[in-house]
Amino acid sequence: MLSFPNKFKCSSWYRPGRLFIVFIVVALALLTLSCQKSSLSNAPQSGKGGGEIIGAGSTFIYPAMSRWISSFQSSHKGVQINYQSIGSGGGIQQLKKGVVDFGASDAALDDKQLQEMPAVVQLPESAGPVCITYNLPELKSPLKLSANTLAGIYLGQIKTWQDPALRKDNPGVELPKYPIVVAHRSDGSGTTNIFTTYLDKVSPAWSKQVGKGIAVNWPTGLGGKGSEGVTGVVKQTPGGIGYVELTYAKENKLPVALVRNQAGQFVEPTADATTAAINAFSNDLAHDVRVPIVDPPASAKDAYPISGLTFLLIPKQGKDPNKTESLKQFVQYVITQGQDQAESLSYAKLPSGLQQQDQTLLAQVGSKSQQASSGGSQ
C-alpha cells in the first residue's frame, strides 16, 4: 500500500462526498448571481421611460414654478422636473427646437407662431400683476403713477422725479431731485410683453414709437437679464424704476407703485386686483385664452391695470409616452391644487371657467386624434 507524507494525506475536507456538496453550492451561487445580473439589466430603472422632465421660459412664473415642482416631486418620487428660468422668448425657442419638454411664457403664441411650432397646446396656469418697483428711499408713501406718466418715463420724456406730471400724480408729496433711471429687460420677455401691451393700449405715442412684444427697441434705460436683472438694477440705483413680477420686489424689499386704472383709482398690485382684471375679460377669455387682460374697463374699479396670464406650452405628442404622462400629471396638479400655492406667492388663482378650459386643452396632450396646434380660440 502506498504511503504519503502527512502533508499530502487527504484531509476530511477533500473527501468525495464533501467535494460533491461544494460543487453543488458553487454552481448554485454562480447561477443565482447570473440570474440577478440578468434581472438587474432588464428591470426598469428609476425614471426610465420618463427620465428628467425639462422645462424653460418665463421668469415671471419662476417663484410659483419652483414651489409647484417641489411639492409635486415630494409625492411623486420617481419624477424629476428641471425648470430653467431663461425668459419667455428663450423658452419658446427651446421648445421650438425640441430641446425641452415644455415651455412657459407670459406671452401667448399667436396663430403664426403656432403654425411654426410642433403641435402644442398652450394653457393658462396662473396670473399676476406686473408691478412697477422703484428706489426712492426718501419717499414715505407709495408712489402713484398714471398711464401717461408711466409711458412718458419709459419714452424718456420724463427725466426727473420732480417732473410736473409726477407732481400731479402725487399731490402734496415731496419728491426727490434724483434723475430717473429706467430699467428694462434685455432679453426676450413675457413680462415685457405684458408691460408693453399695456403701454401700447394706453399711450398713442408709445404705440407709434415703440409698440409691443417680448422684445422692443427701448427709447431709454438700462437693460437687465431676467426679472432678477431688472430688480438688481433698481435696487442698486437710487432713482431707479423698473417692472417685475411682484415676488421679486417683495423678496428684495423694494416698494411698488400704485397705478391708476380706467376707473380713476390708484391700485396696488395684488392677487385680488389681478383677479378683478381677469373677471373684467371673462367673456372674451371664454372664446380665446390669449386675450390680454391689461387696462380693463372702468367698470372694474378694483382691477390692477397691468396684469397678465402666464401659459404652459406643451407638445401634444412627446417623444416619450411615459414622460408625457408624468408631465400631464404635473400640469394637472398645477391647475388644481397648485393654485392655492400660487395665491400664497401673490399670484391670482385661475377662475373656475379658465380651469375648465385648461382641462379640455390638457386632454389633447397624448391624444393621437388631436394633431392641429391649439390654445387659441375654443
Name each region found by the language model.
Residues 1-15:
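N-terminal secretory signal peptides that target proteins for export/translocation
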Residues 9-12, 30-31, 62, 93:
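A general, composition-driven signal for non-globular sequence regions
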Residues 21-32:
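Bacterial N-terminal signal peptides
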Residues 35-378:
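Flexible loop/hinge segments at secondary-structure junctions
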